Amino acid sequence: MKVLHVITGLGVGGAELQLRSILQHTRHESDVVTLYNPGPVAEMISGDGGRVRDLGMIRNTELPALGRLTRLIRAGGYHVVHAHLYRSCIYGRLAARLAGTPVVVTTEHSIGETHLERRKMTLGVRALYLGTDLCSDATIAVSHAVSQRLIRWGVAARKIEIIPNGLDFTRVAFDMCARIRIREEFGLPQDAYVIGVLGRLDPIKRFDLVIKAAAPLLDDQHRLLIVGDGQIRPDLEAEAAQAGVTDLVTFAGERHDVAAMLSSLDLFIAASDQETFGLSVLEALANGIPALYTTCPALDGIETDRARQVPGTLNGLRQEIAAEMAGGRRPREGVPAIREQYGIEAVTRRIDDLYERLMARRSRTRQHGPQQNRPSAIGGNR
């Protein structure tokens, strides 16, 4: 079976890295097309032996790109088109149906209560999403929370499949040599207690709250490491300066060595205002670090003393950080339930199985004729 993954861009981000992991474990022949910004993850996928094409879009609204994508899909003879992220859902769904692709699947990686991938949920955004959803056979929600948000938004429950993000445990395993090396690289004392955050420097991640909460607790033996880059980095650096902890807060910038960066930490903090899954928290736990988080749907129903949900307020977060630090550095320890539920191999099998079920259903429909009163995506009956 031939599968084409359509994604908005391939800069470093959770959805982009998740796609790479899926490609490494799928049993189907798979290609990738990015609407624009091939970025570092495109290089990673190419390095793995995958094929990545850049559609070359330069604006969000570019109708000729729809024609280019349709021709690319038709020429590739793909059985499945799988779209990831909002913009690629709009273009990918439409192009796939225009190209006559049998199966169209979407994964919704990042839908919050009020925002969809950092864009406000306006009537226009919703109309485009729901309108092109008519072209889709199924939408993968990465958590129950995402599923419920999609249903409230107007997506039919029968079209939603809950398949969580997968975690490659070998990719994020603890490495003592890497711990020593990273601490040397950034001038962090080997015996210091290092708190860390990881992700795109975006307001919704609330790294400013972490800086404010941790600032009074920092000294030469208690440091904060911020891993990631983004437009608000100057604001965060100013926040650290205003709090008088410039020398105690280290900005590592964008990094691709996730396991090494996590290995350098003693406590992980995730203070996002809204979260659809919480992959970074799972990665930290898989590395053996205790984690404090404000929201992490991926941990719903998982009992562990290695992760604790904390208040999203300044004083509340500060108290929880102080309490964790007071107990000293915890030994590295995994959470077996996470491996059982979120291993990338099992998750990818579920996605591959979904493709095959949908393809079989489409084949049966063609053999036995269309079902009555079931309109197709662009007119007529399926």
Regions found by a protein language model. Name each.
Residues 13-21, 193, 197-216, 231-237:
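A conserved mid-protein helix/loop that constitutes part of the nucleotide-sugar donor-binding site
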Residues 34, 290-293:
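Short hydrophobic beta-strand element within catalytic cores of glycosyltransferases
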Residues 254, 273:
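Aromatic "clamp/platform" in nucleotide-sugar-dependent glycosyltransferases that forms part
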Residues 173-188, 332-335:
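A short helix/loop element that forms part of the nucleotide-sugar donor recognition site in Leloir-type
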Residues 5-67, 149, 231:
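N-terminal strand-loop element at the rim of the active site
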Residues 307-315, 323-328:
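Conserved acidic donor-binding segment of nucleotide-sugar-dependent glycosyltransferases
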